[in-house]
Amino acid sequence: MRSLLRIFACWCGAALLSLPLVAQQLPDQMSPPRLVNDFAGLLDEAQRRSLEQKLVDFDRETSTQITVVTVDDLDGYAPADYAQRLHDKWGVGRKGKDNGILILVKPSQPDSRGEAYISVGYGLEGVIPDITAGRILDQE
């Protein structure tokens, strides 16, 4: 009985140690960098190009960069954590201003619900605090 308990404890320990390795797969930024990154394939090419142009124009007019990312899977992350990590990894926004916004969309799948999150750079938190970003998602 004790050996069975030890085997079970070792198996649980190995499973727990492997968790951080599973939840590490954030996508690399496309090359050349884009503002619309449709990894889930939700948009057709015309929609993607149209949205990309609108976001480029918005960036040019306001110096605020908005990046849209769609993914099929959050790889074990909570939506907020995934979006923030991706926001940081890609460096969304102007250097020194940290004024970027990352909009994350994970569509529903047969085995999971759809999720979305808006990650706002520190330079914009006074304009778009987390509560406002949450309300935007709730209304849409």
Where are these regions (language model features)?
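Bacterial N-terminal signal peptides
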Residues: 7-20
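Folded, non-transmembrane soluble domains that reside on the lumenal/extracytoplasmic side of membranes
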Residues: 24-140
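Positively charged n-region of N-terminal signal peptides that target proteins for export
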Residues: 1-6
